[in-house]
Structure formats: structure tokens, C-alpha cells
Amino acid sequence: MSDTLRYCETQSAPLQLDVAGILRKRAPGIPGFVARLLARIVRQDELNRLLRVAFPGAGSDFSRRILRELDIDVQVSGIENIPDNGRLVFASNHPLGGLDGITLIALLGERYGDENIIFPVNDMLMHVRPLQGVFTPINKYGRQGRERASGLQRAFEGGGHVIIFPAGLVSRLGPEGIRDLEWKKTFLAMAATTGRTIVPVRFEARNRMRFYRLARWRKRLRIPVNLEQAFLPAELCAARGRTFRITFLPPVSAAAHLDACPAPRAAARAIRDMVYAR
């Protein structure tokens, strides 16, 4: 979504989606009807109205305005599990692809202040200027893996509490239901080396079935391009009136967890399993 966002540099106008403008710039030969079709797919008009309503909010204020406008009911439990001291990593499953991050920013920004939370995201999302104050870029598309690692390292070495989706991708429908893919071990290793405590977060929500069907058919047809990602903006709009249930689970010392389960991938999988355990 973020690659199709334009923003008035004077910040006298809200962030707005402009599919046709981006296509004219990046692929000038594409017919106008294709641009109009894509604008409908991402629900450009509805998103732009939502962004106008949220303007001029930023950070957690922007996020709360989005949730309020969409009439999202956020039910939170497990607050008592959040430690009062230390630098924390809020590691959550990633069921939605947009509103889950917005909701966590709203909740944790209100609790700690925006200046005390940091959310590593791929550098494309840095186009979402109202959230630049809490985002920090990791170069997912960089030539070298160490560029990505350095962005994460800066986030973990800083003083703020880290919000992260260890899977890196939106949950998919599988034999066990809607579940994250493998949680990358990097978040756990960096939490351990920087002396952080992990707070696993269970985020109960889902996209519409058509999103999961598209992902399944793309995989069956061996299409390498992540087509379903183009439908995530529409899923955000379709969430109007829904209820999200968020549970903060008991904290885990990253260093102690790795000592008990020294294989990093298995240790990351164990924390993922905590999120889905009942």
C-alpha cells in the first residue's frame, strides 16, 4: 500500500492515495482503465476519506483516529503481564496486515508515549508519514542482508520498547486455521543480546476469506508475486465495526529462553506457539 501514497510536503493536507499518479510515474504505458481498476481494488476513495478524517493526527493519535472512524472495538486483557521495568519487545502475530500494527501503536503509544515505542518496518512503509515518528526502516529490499540487520539492531539497541511482527508476513490459512508463518529467529537473538524481555502478544482478528483464497491459489499456481498484498488496503476498510481481542501474555526473558532452548529457530517457534496456545 505504501508505495502508492503521496503526501503534501507542506503537511497542510492529509496523506492521500494516488494510484493513477504512481502508475504514470512508474509504468507510463499502462492504460487508464487499469489504473481505475487498481484504484477500485485498493478502495482508494474510501481510504482517502479515512486518511482525511485522521489528519492531522500522527503516531498513536493518528492510529486512534483510524480505529475510532472504523468503529473498531478493541478488547484488551493481560495488562498485568506487562513488566513495569526494563526494555520490552512486544512480539505479536500478524493477522491483518495493517490494522493490527495500527492498533498496537494506539495502545502502546498511549501507555508509554510515542517517543518511547519503536516499530521496525520495511522501508516502503516509511511513506506513511503520520507514523514516521514511531516507525524505523529496515531495508527489506536492500542488496545486502546486513543492511536489514543494522536497522533492526538500531531499534533493539535504543531505549524504546520495540513492537514487532516476527513472521514478517501476514498470517495465512492453513490446516490449523489462520496462523503466522515461521517466526524469524532474529528478534529473539537481538532481544537476548540487548538484554530485553519479550512480551508475547496474541492478536485475535482475521481478514476476509477471499484474501486467504487468493493467497492459496497464488501458491498453487506458483506465482512468485505476492498478489494478495494488493488487497490488504481493502481488508482494512472491510474491518469496519469489528472487534479485535488482544492478550498480553506472561513475559519471557530472551536470554534465559535461549539458554533453555539453545536452537534459535526452535526457541522462536516456542514463543510463536505460546501466542496460539489455549
Segments predicted by a language model, with ranges:
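A cross-family acyltransferase "interaction/gating" segment
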Residues: H161, R172-L258
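C-terminal/domain-terminus segments
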Residues: A255-R278
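Membrane-anchoring hydrophobic helices of lipid-metabolizing enzymes
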Residues: M1-L88, L99-T103, D114, Q132
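Gly/Ser/Thr-rich loops at beta-strand to alpha-helix junctions
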Residues: H94-G98, V170-S171, R206
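Generic beta-sheet signal
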Residues: P120-N122, F165, V201-F203
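A structural motif
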Residues: F156-G168
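Short, flexible loop segments at the rims of nucleotide/cofactor-binding pockets, characterized by
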Residues: R52, R65-L70, I138-Q144, E176-G177
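Catalytic core of membrane glycerolipid acyltransferases/transacylases, capturing the structured
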Residues: L88-R143
